[in-house]
UniProtKB/Swiss-Prot annotation:
Its EC number is 7.1.1.-. It catalyses: a plastoquinone + NADH + (n+1) H(+)(in) = a plastoquinol + NAD(+) + n H(+)(out); a plastoquinone + NADPH + (n+1) H(+)(in) = a plastoquinol + NADP(+) + n H(+)(out). This is NAD(P)H-quinone oxidoreductase subunit 3, chloroplastic. The keyword Thylakoid applies. It comes from Spinacia oleracea. It comes from the Eukaryota.
Length: 120
């Protein structure tokens, strides 16, 4: 028999974690002073007066570096739990992790050959 009361703590946590941010936004909207003027509508950058347009076009090279960083960051997220439980999981999981790393190395070599890692 499926016992629904076992999930009461989950529903309570879900409701509380949903209500707290909603209340925070409501209270800040009610209590915050509303003052619109030229100073409030201008952009603020570390106390320095902004010069020029805020819209800048970035080179695609920055996106390639960001993409390679995200790939290897996700690799770390996947490999860390595996490394922590390496002695429990056995040889088959070691082979799977090795295949995973080899696929990422092939991707890194491909990006390197295409020039995605060259800054100049």
């Amino acid at each position: 028999m499926f016992l629904l009361y076992e999930y009461d703590i989950f529903w309570a946590f879900l409701i509380i974690s949903s209500v707290i941010p909603i209340l925070a936004f409501l209270f800040s909207g009610i209590l915050a002073p509303i003052s619109k003027g030229p100073e409030k509508l201008s952009s603020y950058e570390s106390g320095i007066e902004p010069m020029g347009d805020a819209w800048l076009q970035f080179r695609i090279r920055y996106y390639m570096f960001a993409l390679v960083f995200v790939v290897f960051d996700v690799e770390t997220v996947f490999l860390y739990p595996w490394a922590m439980s390496f002695d429990i999981l056995g040889v088959s999981v070691f082979i799977e992790a090795l295949i995973f790393v080899l696929i990422l190395i092939v991707g890194l070599v491909y990006a390197w050959r295409k020039g995605a890692l060259e800054w100049s």
